[in-house]
Amino acid sequence: VISGDIVLCHSRGLIGACIRWAQRHDYGEIYSQYNHIAVLNKDMGNGDWTVYQAEARGVTDYRLLSTIAPGGKYRVISLPKGVNKKRFIGFLDSQVGKRYGFMSILSCAFDMVLPDMICLRKSDTWICSGLVAAALVFGGFEAAFSWPDFYTVVPAEIAESCSINA
């Protein structure tokens, strides 16, 4: 477990359950078990880490890993091979303080029902998976080059592209 590793989260709340349910149609049970995604930032020395994530307050880098999936679970996976870690982390650092993409969440919901027909998002805003997807693109993750719109990538899509196993 090192800085830059990706954290796939499964929380217990209603919003998390809705995200998992919506992803299940396109990504199946294995990948759709995750409803939030973050990236390890700094080791706190006590077994906990701070994480980069997009949350309702915007993009942050100070929340503790132990707090981001309340009542649920998380899985840490290595940054995919071939990703330039310096560029990946550099991109995340540059986005700290940007606002949350509430319109992108709405756009994701429309995409699941009416693929590529309605695009709703505001520039300089992020959802959790869009932030990580953009960082992966910036870091040179080749599998990400096939994503038609990294602003509306969902956690299951990243899990699938990173070829995680159940």
Model-predicted regions and their roles:
Residues 1-166:
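Cysteine-nucleophile amide-bond enzymes
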